[in-house]
Curated annotation (Swiss-Prot):
It is an enzyme of class 2 (transferase). The modification Phosphoserine is found at residue 472. This is Nicotinamide phosphoribosyltransferase. Belongs to the NAPRTase family. Catalyzes the condensation of nicotinamide with 5-phosphoribosyl-1-pyrophosphate to yield nicotinamide mononucleotide, an intermediate in the biosynthesis of NAD. It is the rate limiting component in the mammalian NAD biosynthesis pathway. The secreted form behaves both as a cytokine with immunomodulating properties and an adipokine with anti-diabetic properties, it has no enzymatic activity, partly because of lack of activation by ATP, which has a low level in extracellular space and plasma. Plays a role in the modulation of circadian clock function.
Length: 491
């Protein structure tokens, strides 16, 4: 952020209103508040059973929040004054903890006396385990732990995008392996089309970066800069794209000149892959007559490295894909691969970028398999469903206090609402461990201090205003790999 933008963000104004009043609500002589974040397990699913269970989550995005919003001198005299004035009007009362913030400014030069411990970024952890913990490091600042809940819990978004994207990768990997015998090109099978479908530039950057944990294809440019700035990669960029047509570059030629539009575009990009949206008027006519006959000579002469990628963009996704493949299969030479599935020639592929979410994706690849088409023939583009059609409830992302110190005594605390057992929270100081069998287990009530459980997988990533541990994007990707990828990799 430039200096002006830096000055704009005020951590004193980046919390839920009610938290401004909480310093007055904790028990007298509270000196520590310790809280944790998890993606709660749903032990009792609603009657409307979800097709996808989301049993494990990808932990990603906390590093961005810590670096962008919490590190360094985040408290200044001006920010305290600004907050004081805003809250006086907002509450019509003097409830703001001016003294507490001045203490942080004076004693710590505006750095937050907080410690955050977290699992490594990119870790794949079963639901119901601790992912990070937060505690104050100065007894005067017991109220600060849950003040920053608001901004820290926004990590639900990159976690959920990365998790949902990875679940789609599981589906694609399974069907690609079954219909081709290998995982070649898996990381380009789901392309991010979501830039225009998200709520803001920042959302675009965060969401696109989360998808790139699992894949390498994106049209959401904002993700690239975020990854380079907050994570870093060994490659010059973490995501790639290809030249592609939109409807305007076709329809601008006029309805009677779709063939001319197609011809011009494939000629402009003859030595690289090029995607051409082909449903401006009639996708089936485009495949059969224009691509299959009129321009066939231009397509068959393209190289394996520079295929034409035909993009349908309307209609029922499964029906459209199958019909397009059927037409192309009659117009171009189809071969059978080693697994007995049909394969278009290497200079021709299809991308479905309309109506793609995790459920339609599953339907399309299953439908293709049943019709004996290899998944090698297709890639997918997903926008709103990939980056926007998600909420904090999908993975039940939750932040709760589990331990306090009052009058010098540590107390394990929790909630356990009578009407919803799913909302029961964990007790005491928490740690995360691997059992000898390789399973993850969260230990409550400080039991992780006992030697027998091995080391804690939560590492200090932030302490007293400093980010103390960072992960490169390459490490994040490695942590998030699928088991099927690890098994298929050459040993």
């Amino acid at each position: 952020m430039n200096a002006a933008a830096e000055a704009e963000f005020n951590i004193l104004l980046a919390t839920d209103s009610y938290k401004v009043t909480h310093y007055k609500q904790y028990p007298p002589n509270t000196s520590k508040v310790y809280s944790y974040f998890e993606c709660r397990e749903k032990k009792t699913e609603n009657s409307k059973i979800r097709k996808v269970k989301y049993e494990e989550t990808v932990f990603y995005g906390l590093q961005y929040i810590l670096n962008k919003y919490l590190k360094g001198k985040v408290v200044t005299k001006e920010k305290i004054q600004e907050a004081k004035e805003v809250y006086k009007e907002h509450f019509q009362d003097d409830v703001f903890n001016e003294k507490g913030w001045n203490y942080i400014l004076e004693k710590y030069d505006g750095h937050l006396p907080i410690e955050v411990k977290a699992v490594p970024e990119g870790s794949v952890i079963p639901r119901g385990n601790v992912l990070f913990t937060v505690e104050n490091t100065d007894p005067e600042c017991y109220w600060l732990t849950n003040w920053i809940e608001t901004i820290l819990v926004q990590s639900w978004y990159p976690i959920t995008v990365a998790t949902n994207s990875r679940e789609q990768k599981k589906i694609l990997a399974k069907y690609l392996l079954e219909t081709s015998g290998n995982l070649d090109g898996l990381e380009y099978k789901l392309h991010d089309f979501g830039y225009r479908g998200v709520s803001s530039q920042e959302t675009a950057g965060i969401g696109a970066s989360a998808h790139l944990v699992n894949f390498k294809g994106t049209d959401t440019v904002a993700g690239i800069a975020l990854i380079k700035k907050y994570y870093g990669t060994k490659d010059p960029v973490p995501g790639y794209s290809v030249p592609a047509a939109e409807h305007s570059t076709i329809t601008a030629w006029g309805k009677d000149h779709e063939k001319d539009a197609f011809e011009h575009i494939v000629t402009q990009f003859s030595s690289v892959p090029v995607s051409v949206v082909s449903d401006s008027y009639d996708i089936y006519n485009a495949c059969e007559k224009i691509w299959g006959e009129d321009l066939r000579h231009l397509i068959v002469s393209r190289s394996t490295e520079a295929p034409l990628i035909i993009r349908p963009d309307s209609g029922n996704p499964l029906d459209t894909v199958l019909k397009v493949l059927d037409i192309l299969g009659k117009k171009f030479p189809v071969t059978e691969n080693s697994k007995g599935y049909k394969l278009l020639p290497p200079y021709l592929r299809v991308i479905q970028g309309d109506g793609v979410d995790i459920n339609t994706l599953q339907e399309i690849v299953e439908g293709m398999k049943q019709k004996k088409w290899s998944i090698e023939n297709i890639a997918f583009g997903s926008g709103g469903a990939l980056l926007q059609k998600l909420t904090r409830d999908l993975l039940n992302c939750s932040f709760k206090c589990s331990y306090v110190v009052t009058n010098g005594l540590g107390i394990n605390v929790f909630k356990d609402p009578v009407a919803d057992p799913n909302k029961r929270s964990k007790k005491g100081r928490l740690s995360l461990h691997r059992t000898p069998g390789g399973n993850f287990v969260t230990l409550e009530e400080g039991k992780g201090d006992l030697e027998e459980y091995g080391h804690d997988l939560l590492h200090t990533v932030f302490k007293n205003g400093k980010v103390t541990k960072s992960y490169s994007f390459d490490e994040v990707r490695k942590n998030a790999q699928l088991n099927i990828e690890l098994e298929a990799a050459p040993h």
